[in-house]
């Protein structure tokens, strides 16, 4: 049973995870946090060479992997412009239209962090004759530093390849609504931490072997490319979609039947929908035409598993 204590725990973990900048390729701080949290619960998590965190939380037989990712969309410094602004390149499927005017952070390789703002190259309606199209080549990072040339930026230690992360702006309202960047997929990661917490603290019983997997390259397509060899089923726990002709709302369990990688395992989707129905959960089975998940990377790596996405 999902108690108020577990809900509060999940909310606390969500705030902690979103406060850690982790665009794909820059996830060590996030995985260090996961390792410490799981170890503090009494588990023995493992960190792969790639950076994924996995942990067995109990049960015997019919091994199941539940996967969530802690890497996020973001950007990288592509070059330093003559005017001291940074030209970015996207990490993952980042949409610049959602970031124009957003506060951001730039992380250098020697451990420094600078704040700035994402702007298009002609942000002022009082100056520009025409609107600038919001696309990558028209975006730049204006640092909160008194620099106006390449040399000034270089003196800060900023260089090509440095990571750019957007302000998460996480808010959990009194009515229980969550507003934040990077709910894809840090909310799912927080939920899986909540499951691990409930097993230890509230005695949740597990009737099969369950491994939680926190991946770090989902946003670029290969996060779930390695899982325990005995895995029989794997379910990606990722963001649900709302919109267009989909049946799901923000208040429902979302079960994906098909995405850009094709159909999910028919029998597993059926079992998930039957389980939701038997437990009285409000749910929808939907098709996501422009979606991909960790478990598809697992299949492409040659694993013989049944796969699902919720």
Where are these regions (language model features)?
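N-terminal hydrophobic/helix-forming segments and targeting peptides
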Residues: 1-309
């Amino acid at each position: 049973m999902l108690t108020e204590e577990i809900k509060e725990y999940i909310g606390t973990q969500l705030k902690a995870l979103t406060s850690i900048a982790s665009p794909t390729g820059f996830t060590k701080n996030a995985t260090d946090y996961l390792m410490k949290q799981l170890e503090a619960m009494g588990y023995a998590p493992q960190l792969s060479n790639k950076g994924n965190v996995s942990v067995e939380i109990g049960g015997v037989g019919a091994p199941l992997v539940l996967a969530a990712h802690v890497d996020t969309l973001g950007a990288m410094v592509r070059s330093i412009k003559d005017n001291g602004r940074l030209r970015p390149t996207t990490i993952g499927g980042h949409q610049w239209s959602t970031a124009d005017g957003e506060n951001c952070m730039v992380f250098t390789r020697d451990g420094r962090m600078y704040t700035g703002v994402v702007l298009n190259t002609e942000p002022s309606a009082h100056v520009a004759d025409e609107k600038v199209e919001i696309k990558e080549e028209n975006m730049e990072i204006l640092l909160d530093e008194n620099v106006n040339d390449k040399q000034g930026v270089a003196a800060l230690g900023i260089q090509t390849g440095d990571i750019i992360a957007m302000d998460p702006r996480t808010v959990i309202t009194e009515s229980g609504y969550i507003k934040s960047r990077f709910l894809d997929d840090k909310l799912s990661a927080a939920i899986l931490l909540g499951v691990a917490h409930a097993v230890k603290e509230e005695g949740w019983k597990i009737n099969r072997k369950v491994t939680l997997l926190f991946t770090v390259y989902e946003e670029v397509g290969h996060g779930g490319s390695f899982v325990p060899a005995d895995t029989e089923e794997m379910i990606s726990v990722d963001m649900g979609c709302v919109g267009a002709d989909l049946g799901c709302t923000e208040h429902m369990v979302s079960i994906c039947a098909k995405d850009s990688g094709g159909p999910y395992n028919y029998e597993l989707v059926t079992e998930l929908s039957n389980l939701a129905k038997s437990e009285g959960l409000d749910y929808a089975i939907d098709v996501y035409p422009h979606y991909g998940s960790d478990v598809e990377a697992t299949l492409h790596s040659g694993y013989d598993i049944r796969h699902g996405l919720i």
